[in-house]
Amino acid sequence: MTKDRIDRRFAALKAENRAGFVTYIMAGDPDAATTLSVLKGLPAAGADLIELGFPFSDPMAEGPTIQRAAQRGLKSGMTLQGTLDLVAGFREGDADTPIILMGYLNPVLNRGFESFAAAAAKAGVDGLIIVDCPPEEAGPLTDALEAEGIALIRLAAPTTDDKRLPMVVRRTSGFVYYVSVAGVTGVKSADAADVAPAVARLRKASGLPVAVGFGIRTPAQAAAVARVADAAVVGSALVDEIEAAAQLNENVTEKVLLKASELAKAVRSARLELA
């Protein structure tokens, strides 16, 4: 069962008393070969889990950085199947690092839930985050994913109240993704003082690790979140590096892995500073 990789990784992180570093990049940005090159380098750069976006024409939860990445991914010809092919390519050399696909419902719906889940499991996908699928409508997708051992990871936000929270975390597995700021990705900054009580509340409600994202751009912000959460997710800051390097005809893989390494070091040392 593929989601076991997620469970094993968080168990190992807990044993090491450190938070995980979760990276996000968009498939096909700027092209498939570069995405695969970055994917293969991320674990050595310090990524504990990897989120791989699949491009969609209307990414409503994303800020300008990820929207542009989705446009570049679509322009390069990236599809949902192409994204699965990238995961399969990554798995040829890495059987341990969990990979979570992140995107929107429409491409998965068009593929068919059972067909998608089977193909995702075969490729080596461990989890799925669907931004625009409310829990009330997620039953058939969850059934298909559970049959293949893939985690459906749900999003909780500062606006998720006590009445709604049980519905959000029901049938969630792997971890809970806490959206630390209201609004779209990569625009506002996460506030660790607000994050700590939210993480405690989500852990209690779900019994699962809590990863925090949507507002972590700097090593200092990543470290602050890593002190209180089970994982810190960084996306826009890495995608910015990809965009800038591609525009300047620089080595995209080299630049983004260097940035990932800086962030990973901050996450890994965060709790040591408290000791």
Swiss-Prot record:
It catalyses: (1S,2R)-1-C-(indol-3-yl)glycerol 3-phosphate + L-serine = D-glyceraldehyde 3-phosphate + L-tryptophan + H2O. It comes from the Bacteria. Its EC number is 4.2.1.20. It comes from Caulobacter sp. (strain K31). This is Tryptophan synthase alpha chain. Belongs to the TrpA family. Keywords: Amino-acid biosynthesis, Aromatic amino acid biosynthesis, Lyase, Tryptophan biosynthesis. Tetramer of two alpha and two beta chains. GO terms for molecular function: tryptophan synthase activity. The alpha subunit is responsible for the aldol cleavage of indoleglycerol phosphate to indole and glyceraldehyde 3-phosphate. Pathway: Amino-acid biosynthesis; L-tryptophan biosynthesis; L-tryptophan from chorismate: step 5/5. The keyword Iron-sulfur does not apply. One of its GO terms (cellular component) is cytosol. InterPro entries: Aldolase_TIM, RibuloseP-bd_barrel, Trp_synthase_alpha_AS, Trp_synthase_suA. The active site is at residues 51, 62.
